[in-house]
């Protein structure tokens, strides 16, 4: 399916089993030139232009593994490559890995101008917030999917986040185009 928007980021997650010690990961990052910052319960790693957040495993639930978040990918192929890169970083064999897409960030243009403040003032029935700051933007949430949100700018640019389903994003974007047209 062809979408009328561009994917700017995919946030994915992976369950790593067995768990891996933070000290070992920090050492491997140092050896391979990856940027790694340690926090109490997580490691923030930047490697090969991707960001990884590795969380500590749960000690109360043995063999539960660890949670890894991945960002900085614009396609599922890039996500799979990032997972392979991370596995190489920690010295694990690459192969098939189950991952989940948690969120897409997308951008597009609408083909008509919107008076953001007027739209905000005349649509109290919608979940909408108008930000009047230096770079004005209108935050508009989907009436069908409460986590799905668009930021609409006076430049006609639209950023959409809050779904792991591209068809939901496409439907929301088409709804935005319809609801913002002045009759």
Features from the language model and the residues they span:
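Intrinsically disordered, low-complexity polar/charged tails and linkers
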Residues: 1-151, 155-159, 163-183
């Amino acid at each position: 399916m062809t979408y009328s928007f561009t994917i700017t980021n995919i946030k994915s997650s992976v369950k790593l089993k067995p768990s891996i010690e933070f000290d070992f990961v920090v050492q491997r990052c140092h050896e391979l030139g990856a940027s790694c910052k340690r926090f109490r319960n997580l490691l923030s790693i930047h490697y090969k232009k991707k960001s990884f957040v590795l969380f500590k495993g749960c000690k109360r639930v043995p063999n539960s593994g660890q949670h890894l978040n991945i960002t900085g990918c614009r396609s599922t192929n890039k996500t799979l490559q990032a997972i392979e890169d991370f596995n190489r970083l920690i010295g694990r064999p690459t192969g098939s890995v189950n991952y989940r897409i948690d969120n897409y960030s997308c951008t597009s243009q609408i083909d008509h101008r919107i008076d953001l403040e007027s739209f905000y003032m005349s649509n109290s029935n919608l979940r909408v917030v108008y930000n009047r700051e230096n770079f004005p933007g209108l935050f508009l949430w989907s009436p069908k999917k409460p986590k799905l949100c668009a930021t609409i700018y006076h430049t006609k640019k639209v950023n959409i986040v809050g779904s792991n389903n591209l068809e939901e994003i496409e439907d929301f974007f088409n709804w935005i185009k319809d609801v913002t047209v002045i009759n």
